[in-house]
Amino acid sequence: MTTEIRALYTRLPAIDRLLRDPAFSPLLAQHGHSQVVAQLRQMLDEAREQISQRQTLPDWSHDWQHACEQRLTAGQRSALRPVFNLTGTVLHTNLGRAIQAESAVEAVASAMRAPVTLEYDLDDAGRGHRDRAIADLLCQITGAEDACIVNNNAAAVLLMLAATASGREVVVSRGELVEIGGAFRIPDVMRQAGCQLHEVGTTNRTHAKDYRQAVNDNTALLMKVHTSNYSIEGFTKAVDEAELAAIGRELDVPVVADLGSGSLVDLSQYGLPKEPMPQEMIAAGVSLVSFSGDKLLGGPQAGIIVGKRALIAQLQSHPLKRALRADKMTLAALEATLRLYQHPEALREKLPTLRLLTRPAEEIRRLAERLQPDLAAHYADFAVSVAACQSQIGSGSLPVDRLPSAALTFTPHDGRGSRLEALAARWRALPCPVIGRIYDGRLWLDLRCLEDETRFMEMLLR
């Protein structure tokens, strides 16, 4: 070891001396002795490593208190950070899907602050059922006899199959054996539920006779799966829910449907493509219908099953129900969201998902044109332009449909793609990260989901 390197090691402070420094008192008070000591030990290890490898001290070594504070503060930052979702995907799975309505946020906060009547009946001072209040709401909205709530729609499908068809056959069209994100496949779910898959028809064409011919003494269910994340077009044929329900009644076999996204309102009245609605399935005679809470419904992550009272009772009494049940925060948010549907005239205003999906393209374009001059002046190395674009709903909902929108695009004057990557990384490192997408040599910020204009500009003009 040379004299110079030995001198560098001697400049490293002892942890005890640092802790006695008055500058560290606020850190000790805020983060505690253990965390501060652990952070200082890590910093000392880094400094020793740099001396060994590069024969220099780290740049931060002139102010140990400041460096330690920065690291501790960064370490305390929540893993679930608010971001600006300007990707063009409204219900972005990686960004948490539906934004909750204010009433849902307030309901969750209230449920977290105090004991609540989750499973307590105030009328007779006995044990109640956690799904009861929401089940009543869902029955009012959908016309179902009863309802069951679990923690997501994958769980809803699993419970529905396990409780009503374990050890028996479930008949499904080959064209509806879907896979959604995260490798959730209908055949795999059936296997986990203990069911036997009985495929009928072909990928593009399935007829009523295919279902009739498939039914046997071991048939438990006829199942309809909404292909929400893909579309088969051209020479096609499918049996709709009403016809399948009629076949089920004729052969005395229950019919169940997995809608995936599930919308409780007719989206076509807002100028959006129509999605199948649970109440339509119930009216058609389907025995059980499952759908998501955090997609088109605009609520928290939840799996909702509505349908016949006797079948719902089977689900509620199945051992899996306890493992899959929703907690009080989910139920509070879901109840508040469903109550918004009781006042449909105000739904578009109060439900963020519907508000964002129905936002007029011209309004978004005016927003982009208003922001463009200041951003163009600030980002001199880029051509900042307003461009028409197409948003998508996301989360497997209406996969082939697009929503006209407007974006701010950033194109480097020197044409170097590395500048786009660097700019995107810079925005992701902001206190409130800005998430866009790189496409066609430009960084796009689709403004459909931008509502806090002031905060957004504070971030980008830093």
Curated annotation (Swiss-Prot):
Task: State the Gene3D superfamilies in the record.
Answer: 3.90.1150.180, Type I PLP-dependent aspartate aminotransferase-like (Major domain)
What is the annotated quaternary arrangement, including any partners? Answer: Homodecamer; pentamer of dimers. Binds only one seryl-tRNA(Sec) per dimer.
Q: What does this protein do?
A: Converts seryl-tRNA(Sec) to selenocysteinyl-tRNA(Sec) required for selenoprotein biosynthesis.
Q: Which keywords has UniProt assigned to this entry? A: Cytoplasm, Protein biosynthesis, Pyridoxal phosphate, Selenium, Transferase
For the keyword Transmembrane helix, the answer is: no
Q: In which pathway does it act?
A: Aminoacyl-tRNA biosynthesis; selenocysteinyl-tRNA(Sec) biosynthesis; selenocysteinyl-tRNA(Sec) from L-seryl-tRNA(Sec) (bacterial route): step 1/1
Q: Catalytic activity, per the record? A: L-seryl-tRNA(Sec) + selenophosphate + H(+) = L-selenocysteinyl-tRNA(Sec) + phosphate
Supply the NCBIfam families for this chain: selA
Q: What is its main location?
A: cytoplasm
**Family assignment from sequence similarity:** Belongs to the SelA family.
> Which GO terms of type biological process are on file?
conversion of seryl-tRNAsec to selenocys-tRNAsec; selenocysteine incorporation
Q: Which residues carry this modification: N6-(pyridoxal phosphate)lysine?
A: 295
Keyword Cytoplasm found = yes
A GO term for molecular function? L-seryl-tRNA(Sec) selenium transferase activity
Would you tell me the Gene Ontology cellular component terms? cytoplasm
What EC numbers are recorded for this enzyme?
2.9.1.1
> So which cofactors does this thing need?
pyridoxal 5'-phosphate
Protein name stated in the entry: L-seryl-tRNA(Sec) selenium transferase
Q: What HAMAP family does the database record attribute to this sequence?
A: SelA
Query: Where is the protein found, in the record's own terms?
Result: Cytoplasm
